[in-house]
C-alpha cells in the first residue's frame, strides 16, 4: 500500500519580510473568525479551567523486569491462639519434669503464662527447684494435687523471667588467654524474697498432708523391669 502524501501546511499570514506579516493584527482577527467566537460567548472569549496536576508517584516503576520470576510472598493471616492446657494439668497438680537441669524432679504447677509455658516450683526449700517456666511437652501430670489457694501468683508473668540484654565487649589478647573463671551472676534480692513467700505458702499446704514432703523431695526414676506405659502417675 503506497504511503499517503502529506499536504504541506499553509500559513494564513505569510511573511513579506522576516518578522513582518502580510496582514495586520485586526485583519487576522476577522480572518480567523475570532469575532464570531467572542460574539457567541457574550462578548468574552471562553476560558477553560486548568487541569489538576497529577501527583508524581511515590515509587517509580521499575525500568527493567527481573530475568527470573520472583515469587510474591503471601500475606500471613494467622493469628496466635492461646496454648491449650493438657486436661491432666490443673493448678496445684504435682508434675514430673522429664528433661533439662531438673530432670526427674517433682514440682507443683501454679498457673499457665500468656506464652503457654507453665509456672512451676519445687518448692525450692524441699527439692531445690525454684520458680521457673516449663513447657508442658516435657512434664507428666500426676494424680497428686496440692491446695495453692494461699499462693499469690499475680506478679509472675513472662516479663518477670526475662533477661536484660548486655552488650558484649571485645576481649583483648591478654583477657582472651586468661584462665580465670567468670564471676557467677547473682540472683536479685527481690526474686529471692518472692521465692521465700511462695515457698512459705506452699509448705503450709504440703505439711498438712502426711508423707507429701518426702514424695516431693524424692527424684522420679525407672528401675529395671518397670514399664512406663503401664504406670499410673
UniProtKB/Swiss-Prot annotation:
GO molecular function, one term: structural constituent of ribosome
A GO CC annotation given for this chain: plasma membrane
GO biological process: translation
Signal peptide: none
Gene3D superfamilies reported in the protein's UniProt record: 2.30.30.30
Keywords: Ribonucleoprotein, Ribosomal protein
Region (Disordered): 175-195
Family named by the database record: Belongs to the eukaryotic ribosomal protein eL6 family.
Name of the protein in its database record: Large ribosomal subunit protein eL6z
Species whose genome carries this gene: Arabidopsis thaliana
Amino acid at each position: 500500500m503506497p504511503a499517503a502524501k502529506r499536504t504541506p501546511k499553509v500559513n494564513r499570514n505569510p511573511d513579506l519580510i522576516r518578522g513582518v506579516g502580510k496582514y495586520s493584527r485586526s485583519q487576522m482577527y476577522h480572518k480567523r473568525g475570532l469575532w464570531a467566537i467572542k460574539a457567541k460567548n457574550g462578548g468574552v472569549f471562553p476560558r477553560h479551567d486548568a487541569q489538576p496536576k497529577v501527583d508524581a508517584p511515590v515509587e517509580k516503576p521499575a525500568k527493567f523486569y527481573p530475568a527470573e520470576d520472583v515469587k510474591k510472598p503471601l500475606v500471613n493471616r494467622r493469628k496466635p491462639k492461646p496454648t491449650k492446657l493438657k486436661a491432666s494439668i490443673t493448678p496445684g497438680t504435682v508434675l514430673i519434669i522429664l528433661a533439662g537441669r531438673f530432670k526427674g524432679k517433682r514440682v507443683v504447677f501454679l498457673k499457665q503464662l500468656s506464652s503457654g509455658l507453665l509456672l512451676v516450683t519445687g518448692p525450692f526449700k524441699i527439692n531445690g527447684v525454684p520458680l521457673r517456666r516449663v513447657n508442658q511437652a516435657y512434664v507428666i501430670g500426676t494424680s497428686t494435687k496440692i491446695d495453692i489457694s494461699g499462693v499469690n501468683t499475680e506478679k509472675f508473668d513472662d516479663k518477670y523471667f526475662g533477661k536484660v540484654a548486655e552488650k558484649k565487649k571485645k576481649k583483648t589478647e591478654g583477657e582472651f588467654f586468661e584462665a580465670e573463671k567468670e564471676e557467677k551472676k547473682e540472683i536479685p534480692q527481690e526474686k529471692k524474697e518472692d521465692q521465700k513467700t511462695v515457698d512459705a505458702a506452699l509448705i503450709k499446704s504440703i505439711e498438712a498432708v502426711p508423707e507429701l514432703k518426702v514424695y516431693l523431695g524424692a527424684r522420679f526414676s525407672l528401675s529395671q523391669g518397670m514399664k512406663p506405659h503401664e504406670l499410673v502417675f
